[in-house]
Amino acid sequence: MTEADLASAFARIEALVQARGLADAVRGTSYGTPSLKVKDRTFVRQLDASTIVLQCPLEQKVLLMEISPGIYFETDHYVGYDAVLVRLDAIEDEELSLRLEDAWRFKAQNGKEDRA
């Protein structure tokens, strides 16, 4: 995976965040990949060209993985953390946009920093 691959995949995320008007969303990096932060807290980051890490409450994570396992999943690394993995090729922009807003709200209101 090249920097260009990551940048291209993350452009979709940035466009959806901008379209939703999510104030104070700032581009950064997290673990060497593109991320977006609010109040200096990561709410989404690119894991690879086809997967993002999206912050969310544990209860929501469990529900999302039960309802749409083809879209939402976790690896051993994320078990017990307020983050869910999202397959970008399996999610429509409308749903992804809503999840991004949820993540933005979660981190804007939550002072706890999670492993992203």
Each model region followed by its residue ranges:
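Charge-dense, helix-prone N-terminal extensions
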Residues: 1-116
